[in-house]
Amino acid sequence: MGSLSSRGKTSSPSPSSSGPDQEPVSMQPERHKVTAVALGSFPAGEQARLSLRLGEPLTIISEDGDWWTVQSEVSGREYHMPSVYVAKVAHGWLYEGLSREKAEELLLLPGNPGGAFLIRESQTRRGCYSLSVRLSRPASWDRIRHYRIQRLDNGWLYISPRLTFPSLHALVEHYSELADGICCPLREPCVLQKLGPLPGKDTPPPVTVPTSSLNWKKLDRSLLFLEAPASGEASLLSEGLRESLSSYISLAEDPLDDA
């Protein structure tokens, strides 16, 4: 739980226990395995079944400058790809290398309910973060709300100055219990897309069009005036076409009959 400085409670730790360079949360909870998420389809232009998709969970195998080797936790395939297509994920909700726009795309993926959230490291303000939350509205489209998480000189964090926290874990725990000024309580971390079909248009089954046995060049005029076939039998001519052809022939033959 955070501390309420407005109520006279201590809002910061002692100077010896914290400093301006304190890192509230490490991005590497497990040395042997670094979890990440795909930020888009890769490689572009490949068949859907071979491509990564937005939100697909990954394991980072190696990092070589701007090119990383990752393995999909869905298909097991390995990819050597630019790091801009990947964001690291720690604790299920802390993202490194994620923009505001991509945060919105991830949270709006199917499977994320209202209250789904993630925290991303600021790409412009060192040591600061942003909280992104999916807000469900019954009479309208869901939207994403963003809240800047500021950092004090002593390392403590806050969204509202009246309420400070020693760590991101404490902040998440507090706002999971009550909204306390944000759009809604935090419900669960953004869901990684482990299930469901890969992206790409579903190809509908081919439509079978029966081939007509009617030969227009050898059409007998008497066929136009036959009664409709019994139920279940194929018809050479539809009722509408039969009537149209009959009317045309009648009109074409009338002048000859009057001559």
UniProtKB/Swiss-Prot annotation:
Compositionally biased region (Low complexity): 1-20
One Gene Ontology cellular component term attached to this UniProt record is: plasma membrane
Q: Primary place of residence? A: cytoplasm
Name all SH3 domain ranges.
31-91
Post-translational modifications reported in the UniProt record: Phosphorylated by CSF1R.
Signal sequence region: none
Coiled-coil ranges from the UniProt annotation = none
- Cross-referenced InterPro entries, in alphabetical order? Grb2-like (IPR043539), SH2 (IPR000980), SH2_dom_sf (IPR036860), SH3-like_dom_sf (IPR036028), SH3_domain (IPR001452), SLAP_SH2 (IPR035052)
**Segments for region (SLA C-terminal):** 190-259
Protein keywords = Adaptive immunity, Cell membrane, Cytoplasm, Cytoplasmic vesicle, Endosome, Immunity, Lipoprotein, Membrane, Myristate, Phosphoprotein, SH2 domain, SH3 domain
Lipid link (N-myristoyl glycine) located at? 2
Q: Which GO terms describe its biological process?
A: adaptive immune response; negative regulation of calcium-mediated signaling; negative regulation of T cell receptor signaling pathway; negative regulation of transcription by RNA polymerase II; T cell activation
Pfam families linked to this entry: SH2
* Misc. comment: PubMed:12024036 confirmed the alternative initiation by mutating the Met in position 1 to Val, and showed that isoform 1 is abolished in favor of isoform 2.
Q: What is known of its domains?
A: The loss of the C-terminal domain partially abolishes the inhibitory function.
| Xref: PANTHER family | PROTEIN ENHANCER OF SEVENLESS 2B
Self-association and partners: Interacts (via its C-terminal domain) with CBL (phosphorylated). Interacts (via SH2 domain) with ZAP70 (phosphorylated) and CD3Z (phosphorylated). Interacts (via SH2 domain) with CSF1R (phosphorylated).
Its biological function?
A: Adapter protein, which negatively regulates T-cell receptor (TCR) signaling. Inhibits T-cell antigen-receptor induced activation of nuclear factor of activated T-cells. May act by linking signaling proteins such as ZAP70 with CBL, leading to a CBL dependent degradation of signaling proteins.
Q: What is this protein called?
A: Src-like-adapter 2
What is the species of this protein? Mus musculus
* Source organism phylogeny: Eukaryota, Metazoa, Chordata, Craniata, Vertebrata
Gene expressing this chain: Sla2
